[in-house]
Amino acid sequence: MSYTPRNVLVTGGAGFIGANYVRWLLGEDAGVHIVNLDALTYAGSTDNLKGLPGEGRHTFVQGDICDAALVARLLREHAIDTVVHFAAESHVDRSISGPGEFVRTNVVGTYTLLEACRQYWLIEQQLPRTTAASGRRFHHISTDEVYGTLGREDPAFTECTPYAPNSPYSASKAGSDHLVRAYFHTYGLPVTTTNCSNNYGPLQHAEKFIPTVIRSCLEGRNIPVYGDGSNIRDWLYVEDHCRGIERVIRRGRLGETYNIGGCNEWKNLDIVRLICRLLDERRPEAAPHDRLISFVTDRPGHDWRYAI
């Protein structure tokens, strides 16, 4: 059975994946109205929202997903029928040095949103499970990092892979995933979840792996590579991710989790060398860029391989 969102609250919609989703959805569906709630931390920017298609159908609100009163007001004022929850602290290195903010945003923030939706949809509007299931959606975006790490010969993650998070970041996302599941089974809140592999594409923050490599090359600085660079990631283009999310929102089974991967595994060092070769072609005067590769001490708990 197909579901059609109309008044959508997007959290974290000024960040990398969220802003790409907002732009893509406004361009794809002329009937959708988006309320975009973002705290505008270091990783989000309204610059990511310039020149949106259907800009009159987009309302930006700067605010914190942990602000229960604000979230409740937005749900009521805009008659929100769909929540798409991107907002999260997501940089693993930052979670190692400061895990508290990850627990607050990723766990408490998700709880705040779930509880606000429960109060508005199921209590104030008195929608029973069957009605809520046909007319409301809470979609939660998560990560494949909740599954832990894979060995070289291990099969890729599936939706049945046990959770085994190894960093404060992935542990906080695992906690949020379990809360979403609990609100479905306990209260009948109409939820779906997607767990994605590593994203790349336009608007990605400079601290992330691929932008760091490109920026280091352009500035002639050392390219930091953890350990020996043999760690493997499954890369997913951000717009493909957006399409997958929307497919799940519209056609996914309530209470289910869906993995979205790129089937595109690369060693970190091979990604670095590929970028260096491409920049050698475009900036031959600075070649060879791979002379900038600098192996650095591996980070604690660095998962070796992800694959979906």
Describe the role of every protein-language-model region.
Residues M1-N199, E239, R273:
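N-terminal Rossmann-like NAD(P)+-binding domain of SDR-like oxidoreductases, especially those catalyzing
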Residues P5, N20, W24, E28, ...:
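C-terminal substrate-binding subdomain of Rossmann-fold SDR/epimerase-dehydratase oxidoreductases
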Residues S45, E153, P202-A206, N264, ...:
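Residue-level signature of the cytosolic catalytic core of signaling kinases
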Residues P99, T194, A206-E207, G252:
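Active-site loop immediately N-terminal to the catalytic Tyr-X3-Lys motif
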Residues T161, E207-K208:
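Hydrophobic alpha-helical transmembrane segments of integral membrane proteins
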Residues A164-P168, H205, R233:
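Conserved acidic
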